[in-house]
Amino acid sequence: MHNDLKEVLLTEEDIQNICKELGAQLTKDYQGKPLVCVGILKGSAMFMSDLIKRIDTHLSIDFMDVSSYHGGTESTGEVQIIKDLGSSIENKDVLIIEDILETGTTLKSITELLQSRKVNSLEIVTLLDKPNRRKADIEAKYVGKKIPDEFVVGYGLDYRELYRNLPYIGTLKPEVYSN
């Protein structure tokens, strides 16, 4: 599995430092507010778990499972909601927790849906951002790290459901995903 990687972009320590920094900022920004953290499954599960431990304010969590990849390395642009939220977010401050922001088409669809539910506020935190890939008019307020336009795996990010369990983030060798 490790031999399939070209290089490591973020070590375990790098990721934990990012979580600490983002957690401190989110604690400051959401102190005393009715915060609901919405994790986008499956990719954000590890990031969300580490991040919310560092947000020192009352919060609740919920999840959405949304897909626009359908097994490949490129977003199809067609967003399918597999699992919607389990509770109401009306009059709450909502923080979408995402693993990676690339084209933005999936996140744009999610934000439009959630904004229609009469939230107080809606922001996005993403561990990774690939601004060069953006197609939709959307940005994350909180960004862990901007990365180059390479296919990354690990720490929740997958290729065909594999590599999610890596404790770091790396780039796959092109021959692994071009077959």
UniProtKB/Swiss-Prot annotation:
Compartments where found: Cytoplasm
Gene3D superfamilies: 3.40.50.2020
Active site: 102 (proton acceptor)
Residues involved in Mg(2+) binding: 98-99
Annotated GMP binding sites: 130, 151-152, 158
InterPro entries to which the protein is assigned, alphabetical: HGPRT, Hxn_phspho_trans, PRibTrfase_dom, PRTase-like
EC number in record: 2.4.2.8
Name this polypeptide is given: Hypoxanthine-guanine phosphoribosyltransferase
Species in which this protein is naturally found: Staphylococcus aureus (strain Mu50 / ATCC 700699)
Gene name of the record: hpt
